[in-house]
Amino acid sequence: MAASTFSAKCTEPRWVAQSRPKSSARSPYDGRTSKLAFLRAPRLGCSARRSRNLCVITNVASNQKQDLKEPFNQEDDAPDVFIPDPVSIASSIKYHAEFTPSFSPEKFELPKAYYATAESVRDALIIKWNATYDFHEKMDVKQAYYLSMEYLQGRALLNAIGNLELTGAYAEALKKLGHNLEDVASQESDAALGNGGLGRLASCFLDSLATLNYPAWGYGLRYKYGLFKQRITEDGQEEVAENWLEMGNPWEIVRNDVSYPVKFFGEVVTGPDGRKQWIGGEDIMAVAYDVPIPGYKTKTTINLRLWSTKVAAEEFDLRAFNAGDHTKASSALKNAEKICYILYPGDESVEGKTLRLKQQYTLCSASLQDIIARFERRSGDQVGWEKLPEKVAVQMNDTHPTLCIPELIRILVDVKNLSWEEAWKITQRTVAYTNHTVLPEALEKWSLDLIQELLPRHVEIIKMIDEELIHTIIAEYGVEDLGLLKQKLKEMRICDNVELPASVLELVVKEEDTSPDEEVIVALEEEEEEEEDQEEGEEEEEEEDQEEGEEEGEGEGEDKPTDEENDQVIEAVTAIDKVSFDPDPKQPKLVRMANLCVAGGFAVNGVAEIHSEIVKEEVFNEFYKLWPEKFQNKTNGVTPRRWIRFCNPDLSKILTKWIGTDDWTINMEKLSLLRKFAYNDDLQLEWREAKRKNKMKVAAFLKEKTGYSVIPDAMFDVQIKRIHEYKRQLLNILGIVYRYKKMKEMSPEERQRSFVPRVCIFGGKAFATYVQAKRIVKFITDVGATVNNDSEIGDLLKVVFVPDYNVSVAEFLIPGSELSQHI
């Protein structure tokens, strides 16, 4: 499309000014005042029309459904909210094109149109965002905090205006300005904050939390280059930095007034008051960047707070810089900034492992300091720390945020001066853990020596937690059977291959000292001495025999151990020798993060029913026997707004038409109403037409991205996820090779009778240092190059690897897929 131009008086948009409240307590976000009423979204299955009644939300961390109460109505206090129309929206876009430019002002081309449009939408989000925050502050509700190393968000523009119910208005406004909404939206880069299902789950959770009006925030890291941008060449996968922030991110608001210190290395000393102090080392600052997350058909807009890292200005060595040593002058800054350079830096080296651990601790430390600061502010002059679990729930998405547990204890004990017992009880009631894998080798383990060097105070705390756990295990199983105890400790301890604490050794040694077999052992030793004496000679032996006879006569009634008893004693001695609690010097000392999560939190959940059962019966079976009340299931889902309503509009229209309502977008159980129409010819025809239309989009997309042509009438067989041996892309492609081999063995007529045309689509990234996964990518692309150029096979079989798979690619592929491979 040719570049558009426009001219208008660029003043602040009318709808922004009219939406701004007249008076309120100061909002912590942008300095503006806000007292917008917090309007309740419809309950699941209810009408889309919303009440203006305020709601109180309680019981956030409960397993039960959230109760929405309506204690009062402040309709009179609520400002008159102005709903933007296309004219007002066009004015807003013009305003931002002029006054918040990301490009030169001469032309209103697509990139500039996108940034101006995004800024316009952000204005609408901030109004609701401030109102949500103010309401949560006023009501002092319990708040959930979701910590994740990944957020795989996808593009934000269409999702935001869809949730705001402004898609049509923005499409019309952009049309007035000479652009198409889809073309403008295509200019947006996916936020490079995640890679796989872990990050997509986190993003879907935030969307659903906002839609259901839960008081919740997300916390993550603001990666400058994401994981990487994937290119597919004749050599397979190549990685390049994904500079998604090159032109800035219009959805984020930098919060330079919100920053927290984060410390690494150093040493632990005991202060004059007897309390531990972590001093020295390397200090950085974590700075907040906020991203509004709007709910669907609700005024609720929650927050995703991302941390970026830097150092204080005084850390810049001006003297070294002026002396010409520029590397030394900026070394502190570079060390801080690289923490947030990329997601999952290679960990083959010690430096890589250290950087990953720095990332995890930065997320935990900055987030907890922020959470506690908010709790203290809401508590006023009297802070009751015992009430922290009643106001705060911290959910750890996988084991990456595990350091939340020792960090929360450190803050409570070292900074807030609570006792160990108080801090430990509070932590156990505040933190919860989501498990994502049942593979034992995939459960995170960190070198104790590495953590000791980087986070010395946390190692002390982790060892104390380990000691608490050991005493709990001993209380459950006792010390009578040392073999059983050793087995339980081997499976359950947090510190693996580490010496037992002194308090535990006392119990074990005491049990060994008071063993009932001790008298029998002494008798056996005496008998061995007698046998040695017998070898000295016949005369001495006879004399000794006479003496022994006399002694036996004197001590008549005392029994010597029988051979059978002696054998039992030998077995007992051997068994005790085998029960050694000493660490193996040949094996590394490790911290098992998953065990720390289970011991340190109040809940552990799997992400599917079968997964949760495996977690209970296999992965953490010993913990389940000890604390069955901790284990629960939370089946993963996806937001139907992004994944059906917005990316598959043709199917959405069909669902709404036949169900009779669009309530399925917030209550998927409504889709069950389609069952009665399953054999309706009209529905089936509409469904097939929508699917074929989506497949034609996929075919055009594949042609653009890979150069391969596919027919939309073939079956689209899709496997899109990160490349890993346990994800079994190798098994899939070997099956395709077998199919190809069978086709080649047949005549053309036999092939046509035996096979349905099939397009096998792969997508996903292999980690840069994961050699075997990269070989799988190479193998898939090589098979594709062979099969796709075989004129004998033609359209019967195609193999396509889509480069740089992300959410936006998935939004193309999923609506057109017919078989999704999960093997």
PLM feature segments, named:
Residues 2-20, 26-31, 36-539, 545-823:
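A conserved ligand/cofactor-binding region detector
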